[in-house]
A protein has these predicted regions:
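Catalytic phosphate/nucleotide-handling subdomain of diverse soluble enzymes
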Residues: 65-126
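Glycine-rich beta-alpha junction loops
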Residues: 12, 16, 39, 61, ...
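Active-site/ligand-binding loops adjacent to catalytic centers
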Residues: 1-53, 99-126
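Generic beta-strand/beta-sheet core signal
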Residues: 35, 56-58, 85-87
Length: 126
């Protein structure tokens, strides 16, 4: 008998940066950008309408960053190849899309106090 307990978190199952991505970032091959939740779902819905694939919320962040980069090129007239990774479909995340389309999904940012509290708790684990 095999049992599987899914994490409580929706979407991402690993809230961190992988080793390869971290090294590419450190070596200057890529840059990290901040994409808010609503912008990412805007991009995901646009992608779904254009491509017929409902992207996973994780992929929506990459799609939003790609759209930003394409818009920069459009404004400057620069031609470039822009590559992104569609990591998966969003079929198990339809509840999140429902919240977004219903207007119930909001951008959320941790306060400095929240961040400090979490860091303090991590320090207590050692």
């Amino acid at each position: 008998v095999q049992t599987c307990a899914l994490p409580i978190s929706g979407g991402l199952r690993y809230h961190g940066a992988g080793v390869i991505v971290s090294q590419l970032l450190k070596d200057g091959y890529m840059e990290a950008v901040d994409i808010k939740q609503l912008e990412s779902f805007d991009a995901g819905c646009l992608f779904a309408q254009a491509e017929g694939i409902i992207p996973a919320p994780e992929s929506c962040h990459a799609i939003a960053a790609t759209i930003r980069e394409a818009n920069k090129c459009k404004e400057t007239g620069e031609e470039k190849v822009i590559l992104f990774n569609l990591s998966g479909h969003g079929l198990i995340d339809m509840a999140s899309y429902d919240k977004y389309l219903s207007g119930d999904l909001v951008n959320y940012e941790l306060t400095d106090a929240d961040i400090q509290k979490n860091l303090d708790e991590i320090g207590n684990l050692a």
